[in-house]
Amino acid sequence: MAIGIIAEYNPFHNGHIYMINYIKNKFPNEEIIVFMSGKYTQRGEIAVASFETRKKYVLEAGVSKVYELPFETSTQAAHIFAQGAIKMLYEYNVDKLIFGSETNDIDLFYKIANTLKNNEQEYNLKLKEFLKQGLGFPNASSLALKSLVGYEIVMPNDILGLEYVKAIVNNNYNIQAYCLKRTINFHSEFTLENFASASYLRTLIYKSEDISKYSPMIFETIPDRIENYYEEFKQKVISTSKEELAKISLISEGLENRFKKIVLEAQDYDSFVNKANSKRYTSSRIKRIMLYILLDIKK
């Protein structure tokens, strides 16, 4: 059978190579199959390199195959991203999954997933209560989880890892999940020997700085960025009617009105995101909607 890795590899770096080598040592007879995002990432941004370029580096690191996650999976919130990716593992007969985790407690993830499955109605009621208070889905979900099981999962990789395990448990998939302790925090600007977070490396890449200590990837030019398309986005929002904007995927509860107003005030991409996000709407959701508007992705 095979071990699956679900990833963006944005960029592919030494921490990812460490995980691949760990899997080779722990499961020497298993194929390693990677399921990787394409051009666009979960936060609605453009990956620093094309799917094919990243795939080349990943194959050179010793994995067996690399498959592309569909757009409708790779540009979604954690729970939808996880459901789509895990379903793909199941369809490709992958029977093991390994993911990075800050907590590194797979038994805890399974305990929480099973508790949620057995108390789904109670969890959904608590979730609705917190959503009614004006909280965004990630915060409401975290608080509903804490009130039900006594644990609050707050770190990015733990949140995604729990969603993977929930997708496995809820669908009774024959997939065993494992986790590996992360060496660097998700958004950390600190480095550790030859390791650095993908977030920090992207900052260096966009400044044309050398990342060879932390990644095998070579960048001869500055990659394209979603920020470069703000003017196009702005004109689309201005020229599109509220009724048509409301048809864009993820737009709900009058967000089209909010976008119409803010786009006249915000001078650039970051300014728009900062003005548009709120307790209810995370920056990541705003960025995904901005991408969907640019690409005209309807509900």
From Swiss-Prot:
Gene Ontology cellular component list: cytoplasm
EC number: 6.3.4.-
Keyword terms, alphabetized: ATP-binding, Cytoplasm, Ligase, Nucleotide-binding, RNA-binding, tRNA processing, tRNA-binding
Any one GO BP annotation for this protein: tRNA modification
Residues binding ATP, per UniProt: 6-19, 100, 157, 182
GO molecular function: ATP binding; ligase activity, forming carbon-nitrogen bonds; tRNA binding
Subcellular location: Cytoplasm
Domain of life: Bacteria
InterPro entries: Rossmann-like_a/b/a_fold, tRNA(Met)_cyd_acetate_ligase
Annotated catalysed reactions: cytidine(34) in elongator tRNA(Met) + acetate + ATP = N(4)-acetylcytidine(34) in elongator tRNA(Met) + AMP + diphosphate
PANTHER family from the UniProt entry: TRNA(MET) CYTIDINE ACETATE LIGASE
NCBIfam families reported in the protein's UniProt record: PRK13671.1
Function: Catalyzes the formation of N(4)-acetylcytidine (ac(4)C) at the wobble position of elongator tRNA(Met), using acetate and ATP as substrates. First activates an acetate ion to form acetyladenylate (Ac-AMP) and then transfers the acetyl group to tRNA to form ac(4)C34.
Family: Belongs to the TmcAL family.
HAMAP family noted in UniProt: TmcAL (MF_01539)
Protein name per the record: tRNA(Met) cytidine acetate ligase
Gene designation per UniProt: tmcAL
